[in-house]
Amino acid sequence: MRFIRNDTGAKKRASVFLLLLSLLLPLCGQASSVSAVPAYMRVGMVMPENELLHPLTATNRDLVSVLGLVYESLVKLDDNQQPVAELAESWEVQDGGKTWVFHIRDNVFFHDGRRLTAYDVKATMDVIKQLAGNSSADNKKGLYWLLVGNDNVSGVIKSWEATDDYTLNVYTDRPYYGVLYAMMFPILQAQSAYDENPPGTGPYRIDYYTPGETLALVGNQNWWGQTPYISSIDALCYKTDDEALQAFENEEIDILMTRSPSAIRYRGVVSNRINSYDYSTRQLECLMLNNSSGSKTRDLKMRRAIMSAINKTRLITSVYQGIVTQTDTIQKSGTWLYKDIGTLSDGYKYGYDPDRANALLDELGWDQYDDKGYRCKTTENGKQTLTLRLNYYNEAGNALRKEAALEIQTMLAAVGIKTTVSAYSYENGAAKLKSGDYDLFLCAYNFDFTPDPTFCLLSNGYGNYARYRSDTMSSLLKALRRAPAVDGVTEEERKQNPGWLLTLMKNKFRSDWGAITDQFAEDSPFLPLYWRNGVVLTRYPYSSIRDIREYELLDSIESYR
């Protein structure tokens, strides 16, 4: 395998290819009827020039999506985000759910011809553990370190071993269905697990890599799945989103994956040369509310008054122009774990309602107004105006969060709440959140692959910036990792269904998530606003996936034709 060579003419050859292709392929009138998929594709990647190609340390969104064509995992997600088999043919649980036994496919080969075994999976997990412990910076650990955790954060898995060539045992401290999500990491060959550009098992293999220019892939003719129709893919590197967008407009690339606000103009385009697909991310934009004792947002009525005053629809249309998905929960709609929120036990219903906001503020005693129209009340220290600190942190190359903060300031002013808006760098903003020195904070959570909100809702969770405390919620979160009740399962039922315990664990996981969603809605510790989306711009339809997800943006391209 060749990894690095000088290939400065790659982009020029690609442009000539597209020019010839444009003369040969007929133009069509609808975005859903664009030209037939060619056997060669060019993908744009925005990434640093010196990026290394190790799949376990890569964190660049575009690069991870491209490497997803080279490397595969034991488990992947379907369109409902349920775990399904990939390199693992099947699995089962033993020891009351604390031992997971994965059966590896016996017909899978690495790109260098060596057969995949369970010992390769074990070696890959060993590397992940070493990465998790070696670096203090999360961005140096890769995307998968929470699988095993470190001294500060508990991992999902305790230990693992290969018991034969095609059997991997994974051991946990407690029964937990989330283990399946944790097993979604790229599998490497034991002999080359620490090497840069190690061979994978995926539908494409790396032909060569010129840092800062081109990552060239060619189809894996010995793939265990269907032989890829698109025989070669060149991923061309760009320094900025604007540079990549310009390349797309110049027809130098066929596919561009981007979260840049500049790509908004392409959304919904009906063209004979362009398709645009929205893709989902794991970034949840929130308005953090300080639940600390003594905070003005400690009272549930105050938090709900603020929530009722915010018009999410207006934020989405005026600021984000539709490149987000509105939510009231911390779980995405359309997934198997999603549960809709109805009317709560006290009659409250999520949604924009300024009349309800005004009524709640009146109940709290903020029923007077100063000469500027802001709410106030008389205290022993005199008249006090209702003033809240609204903070946000900047996102590189993106002013949308600033615009959203100013819109929220206007919305709160409409119900008489005065706010002072302050901007911080990401580092300083994170320090403010951790210290609790804020009233309102416009920020974002990046959720892990494993759907588990313990980190942000448990009383001592490392991401519990709202300083939320609830014994009920803590019990629900702990129950998420407990074994299901098995007393009601008869011996006959156990014999007839060997996977009975796994089914119980799956059903309990969903039920527990529903209870967590309900409790979160009742307590309203912070306000989920929307999930960030991105856009895939393409000149050819390339995917049959309904749920196109960040980090997996090229999934199924090998089978599309």
Residue ranges and their predicted role:
Residues 165, 171-232, 237, 241-246, ...:
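Gly/Pro-rich hinge or "lid" segments in bacterial periplasmic/extracellular proteins
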Residues 24, 32-40, 84, 90, ...:
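Surface-exposed, Gly/Pro/Thr- and Asp/Glu-enriched linker/hinge segments
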Residues 47, 135, 207-218, 234-294, ...:
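Extracellular/periplasmic solute-recognition and catalytic clefts
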Residues 38-47, 99-102, 121-124, 168-170, ...:
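Short, well-ordered beta-strand elements
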Residues 44-95, 199:
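N-terminal lobe/hinge region of extracytoplasmic solute-binding protein
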